[in-house]
């Protein structure tokens, strides 16, 4: 399991988050069948504040059931930030929401 790097900046940037997700991708792919992972929301818009959570969009190869809870916890442990996890399949039937997320998501 990838460990949180010791040199994590106190203030994450989108680039540092994407880099951390890229490093974690092989593990996430093997463990959770993650096809694609990206960041959207306040961090992408550089509007995050103290206590902001990190909005992460994940596309899976197949449903993982309750393992989604473990995925969220792993992402929080890897990044050291609270994560709001959104599954792409879960918002696909909400076209406006999907469009808004697609407009700003930055993939790892």
What does each model-found stretch correspond to?
Residues 39:
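Conserved histidines in hydrophobic membrane contexts and catalytic metal-binding motifs
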């Amino acid at each position: 399991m990838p460990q949180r790097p010791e040199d994590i900046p106190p203030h994450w940037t989108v680039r540092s988050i994407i880099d951390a997700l890229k490093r974690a991708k092989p593990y996430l792919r093997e463990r959770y069948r993650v096809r694609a992972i990206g960041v959207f929301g306040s961090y992408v818009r550089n509007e995050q504040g103290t206590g902001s959570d990190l909005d992460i969009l994940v596309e899976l190869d197949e449903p993982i059931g309750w393992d989604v809870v473990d995925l969220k916890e792993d992402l929080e442990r890897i990044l050291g930030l609270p994560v709001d996890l959104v599954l792409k399949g879960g918002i696909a039937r909400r076209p406006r929401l999907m469009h808004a997320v697609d407009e700003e998501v930055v993939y790892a």
